[in-house]
Design a protein with these regions (language model features):
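Compact, charge-rich alpha-helical regulatory domains located at protein termini
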Residues: 144-219
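Short polybasic/polar patches that bind polyanions
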Residues: 41, 56, 122, 179, ...
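Short, well-structured beta-strand/strand-turn elements
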Residues: 60-64, 87-90, 124-129, 184-187, ...
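Short, amphipathic alpha-helical segments
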Residues: 68-71, 75, 107-111, 115, ...
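Residues that scaffold, gate, or flank divalent-cation-dependent active/transport sites
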Residues: 1-97, 102-104, 109-119, 128, ...
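Short, conserved secondary-structure transition motifs
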Residues: 132-146
Length: 220
């Protein structure tokens, strides 16, 4: 499960769509926009916009980031997920991973389990996206790539081939090199010779890639 507005919704869970709302963070030395809802986007608010510019727009609710509250909200969501599986991985601020295979029989199958979890999050007011996958990284990247869909949400190795390399755990310098090489998607990257990949990007990047596709176990 991925929570695209986690920072903002840790302070206001049930956002009113018609009310522009932004969350600012001064971690870079000055207050900058970290997250905003769709109404604020429609007014021209963008990530990393200075607070002074947001204030000039007027009519926007402005909230300051609170890491203590975020920690409490993350802990609460992890505890909630524990109702459905004993295997839950903390991926906040992005979200969480839940190993559901062992819980399917108890909840009547995957569709019913995912629906129950989705209904719970809807009741709590969270905006979220989700995906299932054969590997943890498949599910994680799938949830980031998708908006909330129906329960037919399995993210496959074939689909991951279309994902931009910018969504994988490459460093900025590595992304720049891939761009120069004409590599845009993970499918493009997969076609490159493994020996050359290890030399250019290191064994860690190659190992993560193998875990993504299930070629190597992922001990999360």
């Amino acid at each position: 499960f991925n929570f695209p507005l986690f920072f903002l919704q840790s302070l206001i869970k049930k956002l009113i769509p018609s009310n522009p709302c932004v969350l600012v963070d001064d971690g870079k030395g000055e207050p900058l926009v970290l997250q905003m809802n769709d109404s604020a986007k429609a007014l021209g608010v963008r990530k990393d916009m200075p607070l002074a510019l947001v204030e000039r727009l007027g009519g926007i609710t402005i909230l300051e980031r609170n890491k203590e509250i975020e920690k409490k909200e993350a802990d609460s969501l992890l505890l909630w997920a524990g109702k459905f599986s004993p295997l839950v991985v903390d991926k906040f601020p992005d979200g969480l991973l839940v190993e559901v295979k062992g819980s399917l029989k108890l909840f009547g199958g995957q569709e019913k389990l995912i629906k129950k979890m989705s209904d719970d999050l809807d009741d709590l007011g969270y905006k979220f996206a989700f995906a299932t996958g054969a590997t943890p990284l498949l599910a994680e990247i799938g949830a980031k790539k998708r908006r909330k869909e129906d329960v037919s949400n399995r993210f496959t190795s074939k689909e991951i081939n279309t994902v931009p390399v910018s969504m994988f755990s490459f460093l900025p310098k590595q992304l720049e090199l891939l761009k120069k090489m004409g590599v845009r998607t993970l499918g493009d990257y997969k076609k490159l010779p493994r020996k050359g990949l290890a030399e250019r990007f290191g064994k860690d990047a190659l190992q993560q890639f193998d875990r993504l596709y299930g070629y190597e176990p992922d001990p999360q």
